Each structure stands twice: as C-alpha cells, then as structure tokens.
C-alpha cells in the first residue's frame, strides 16, 4: 500500500498527516487532487512519496505569492495572450514551483519600487545611458497597468502572431516584455527550475518562424539547438521592434548557462543574426537581484531566498 509521509505546512509550520493510499496514487494537478492537506491554510502537497520531490499547491493560487504582491495578479493572468492556456496558467500559479509566480513577484516589485530600469542596467542588460523614463511592462503579453502604450503593444503583438499564422486561441505570450519607447524593446524568457525547452528538428512549429523577415539567422543550427521558445521570441522581438533596438534575454539560474545546457544555448546564440541593435543576453537571477536587495522590503527578500533566486 503506497505510503505518503507526513510533512510540515510551509505556512503555519504545523504537521500535515501522512496518508496510506489503496491503489495507485493519482498525480496532483490541483489542490483538490492532493491527498495531504493543511485545510486551514488551504495548502495541499503533491502526491509524491519522496519528501524532497513534493510541490505545495494552494487552493487559492494567489496564496502562493506574498500579500504585498497580489494586487493586479488576477487581472494579468486573465489577460494572458494564450487564451486556451489561461485556466491552467492560473491554477499552476498556485504551485510552489511556479515560474509565473516568480516572474510576477520579481518584475512587479521592480516596477512598483521604481527599480526596474536600474536593475536591468546593473545586470548589464541596458547600455543606453540616455534611457531614463519608466518603461512599459507586459507579462505574458498582458499590460500590467491601464496605460495606452501597453494596450498598443499587446495589439501589435496579436497582429504579429496572426501574421505568423499562430492559432488565435494559442498566441505566443513572451514571459516579460519591457518597452523603452524609441530606445527599443526587450523580451525576457524566464527560467526558474526548468531548463530551456528542447524541440526536435522536425517539430511542426519551426517552419512558422524559420523564414520570417527580417531574420538572417542560420535556421538549421537554430533548430539543432532545440531552443524553440527562444527562437520564437527572437522572431517576435525583432518584428515588434520595427527598426528599434531589440534585445532577447534568457534569465535563469546560473546552471542554465553551463554544462550541456549552456553548450546547447551557445549553439543557438551563435546561429543568430545579432548586431549592435539586435542583441541576445544571458542573465542569472543574482545578476538582476543582488544589487537591490539591501534596501528591499523583508517580504521580497524572503520570497527571493525561499524560491532559490539568491543565496
């Protein structure tokens, strides 16, 4: 009989009783699937028997992020560009392993605290010293404020996805878009615990982006890297820039850039048509966050440490 061991609730720090299950233990894809729960906190534990492999799942997905960061999160998730994925995106936002939750908390804090531009500059992602105005931020293709520029960018992104014959219900939604107006645009592909995706060279999606103007990349080398999400974002950021400076950033843990994963990423990068106005950059979480944590509120520093973004 499968035995799921007892755990400690990450919120109230009280025990969650272990469970013996008759038969095969189901995979938990939402709170209601969890056989071990802290009902008062609304936190369930995935049905992994190995304590080290457990993912905690919140009944209310917003419970997975600090109270101070929750304003606007539901609205942004509801506007994510990939319509078909919205429901599962919101549900997975409540997982302790959620990449989207990390993306929201980090970038909204940097924006709301007025540190977004400075953090990008200190991470070496912005070189333009004349750039001073607060940029426009979109997460998952959704504007995070009511400004007209965000809606304009979202509308243009929809047009580009349609022109590439993407499914209207499954448009590409870059993790992060930072628009600097006449100074250019930046896409950020965020990785938390996972590596970059690995698609085979015969994957059906490649032809959609392979011949997109104005790209002059070595597409066969791009395909051999398997970095499909990055390739799609490179195509879209170049098209969205419309002659302005364009930057694609791969943001993640430092291990993303070493070993076999790093070699695969380097294969992708060397196949791109980069120049002074079309850049690819790598950034570790520590590059983005370390400089500003000394003055950060306690809730934000704790979140970054608990999620392993910084040591």
Where are these regions (language model features)?
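Short, flexible loop/turn elements at secondary-structure junctions
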Residues: 42, 108-110, 178-182, 191-194, ...
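Nuclease-adjacent, charged terminal/linker segments that flank catalytic cores
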Residues: 1-142
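Acidic, metal/cofactor-coordinating or nucleic-acid-engaging core segments within structured domains
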Residues: 197-251
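A short acidic (Asp/Glu
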Residues: 107, 118-119, 198-200, 257-267
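Phosphate/oxyanion-binding active-site loops and adjacent basic polyanion-contact surfaces
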Residues: 98-102, 169, 222-230
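Active-site beta-strand-loop-beta-strand hairpin of nuclease catalytic cores
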Residues: 178-187, 195, 238-244
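Non-catalytic C-terminal interaction segments of nucleic acid-processing enzymes
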Residues: 1, 231-311
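Active-site metal-binding core of divalent-cation-utilizing nuclease and nuclease-like domains
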Residues: 20-23, 129-183
């Amino acid at each position: 009989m499968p035995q799921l061991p007892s755990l400690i609730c990450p919120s109230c720090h009280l025990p969650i009783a272990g469970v013996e299950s008759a038969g095969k233990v189901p995979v938990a894809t939402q709170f209601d699937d969890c056989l071990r729960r802290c009902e008062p906190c609304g936190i369930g534990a995935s049905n992994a028997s190995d304590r080290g492999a457990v993912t905690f799942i919140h009944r209310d997905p917003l419970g997975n992020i600090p109270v101070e960061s929750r304003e606007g999160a539901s609205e942004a998730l509801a506007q994510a560009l990939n319509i078909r994925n919205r429901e599962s995106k919101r549900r997975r936002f409540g997982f302790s392993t959620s990449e989207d939750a990390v993306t929201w908390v980090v970038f909204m804090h940097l924006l709301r605290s007025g540190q977004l531009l400075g953090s990008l500059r200190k991470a070496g992602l912005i070189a333009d010293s004349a750039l001073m105005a607060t940029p426009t931020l979109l997460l998952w293709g959704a504007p995070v404020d009511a400004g007209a520029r965000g809606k304009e960018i979202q509308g243009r992104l929809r047009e580009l996805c349609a022109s590439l014959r993407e499914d209207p219900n499954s448009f590409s939604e870059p993790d992060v878009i930072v628009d600097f107006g006449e100074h250019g645009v930046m896409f950020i592909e965020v990785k938390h615990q996972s590596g970059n995706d690995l698609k085979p060279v015969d994957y059906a999606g490649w032809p959609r982006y392979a011949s997109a103007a104005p790209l002059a990349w070595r597409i066969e080398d791009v395909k051999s890297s398997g970095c499909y999400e990055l390739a799609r974002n490179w195509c879209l950021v170049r098209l969205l820039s419309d002659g302005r400076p364009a930057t694609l950033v791969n943001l993640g843990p430092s291990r993303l850039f070493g070993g076999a994963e790093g070699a695969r990423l380097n294969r992708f990068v060397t196949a791109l048509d980069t120049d002074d106005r079309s850049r690819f950059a790598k950034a570790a979480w520590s590059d983005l966050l370390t400089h500003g944590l000394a003055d950060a509120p306690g809730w934000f520093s704790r979140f970054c440490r608990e999620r392993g973004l910084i040591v």
